[in-house]
Amino acid sequence: MTHPNELPLSPLSALQFYATAPYPCSYLEGRVARSQVATPSHLINSDVYTELVRAGFRRSGVFTYRPYCDGCRACVPVRVPVERFTPNRTQRRVWKKHGGLIATVAPLHYDEEHYALYMRYQSARHAGGGMDRDSRDQYEQFLLQSRINSRLVEFREPPNPGYAGHPDMPGTLRMVSMIDILGDGLSSVYTFFDPDQPHTSYGTYNILWQIEQARSLKLPHVYLGYWIRESPKMAYKANFTPLEGLFDGTWKVLDPAAPDLSPVDAAKGGSRGLRIDRG
């Protein structure tokens, strides 16, 4: 019989948590934010990080945090239950439209072409926000430093037939995505794509691709970070249904249209099986 003092400790028991000083909220103008940070970072391996993500944490490089704001609960951690996800008509069209993209999964690594696309994306989508001036070192610290099981995925067009004399010439780079592989799912870290291609919905395609990958790996969830009703930048996440949100430590199906963000009956959220037209 195991003595109570010999019971296995929680994976989080060796960590310490502290709250940051207040800082301007990057999502809601005029708001003040705080974060709760998990330390020390060298103890946060893939198993520990899986538990932290289940508790609503995210990471930026080796910095692991979750919202810890005074009097505000606008940030809702969300995830897609893979086997219950049903793509809508628009998502099926996006999947078919970009089905020819070639996805290559690799360890995190620096590539000058990736960095150039990142800077174009930031300049077009987030001009004046600071990230459009990121140096190569800042880019690496943000996206290429990880102590857990992380991958870089690049999406390219098929090689141009005009380069028949150069069989190793890759197709045009359209998108790069960083993902973490957890014990119970994939976690979408960050994605940037070609901003000069209008109305492409690359971001939507990326999430659909991650859902398919999770399904093939028999992982039940795709974690999408935080959803904020008042933030237009976050609106796309509500299109992936059913969507689960973390409420008081429990994951429940979320109704984005509910005035009080009340969870809904899970039996009403979506149907089983992923039905994406591959044609």
UniProtKB/Swiss-Prot annotation:
GO biological process, one term: ubiquitin-dependent protein catabolic process via the N-end rule pathway
Compartments in which it is found: Cytoplasm
Organism annotation: Paraburkholderia phymatum (strain DSM 17167 / CIP 108236 / LMG 21445 / STM815) (Burkholderia phymatum)
MF GO annotations: arginyl-tRNA--protein transferase activity; leucyl-tRNA--protein transferase activity
Enzyme Commission (EC) number: 2.3.2.29
Domain of life where this protein originates: Bacteria
Function, as annotated: Functions in the N-end rule pathway of protein degradation where it conjugates Leu from its aminoacyl-tRNA to the N-termini of proteins containing an N-terminal aspartate or glutamate.
Keyword Transport included in the entry's annotation: no
Catalytic reaction annotation: N-terminal L-glutamyl-[protein] + L-leucyl-tRNA(Leu) = N-terminal L-leucyl-L-glutamyl-[protein] + tRNA(Leu) + H(+); N-terminal L-aspartyl-[protein] + L-leucyl-tRNA(Leu) = N-terminal L-leucyl-L-aspartyl-[protein] + tRNA(Leu) + H(+)
Keyword Cell cycle appears in the UniProt entry: no
Protein name as annotated: Aspartate/glutamate leucyltransferase
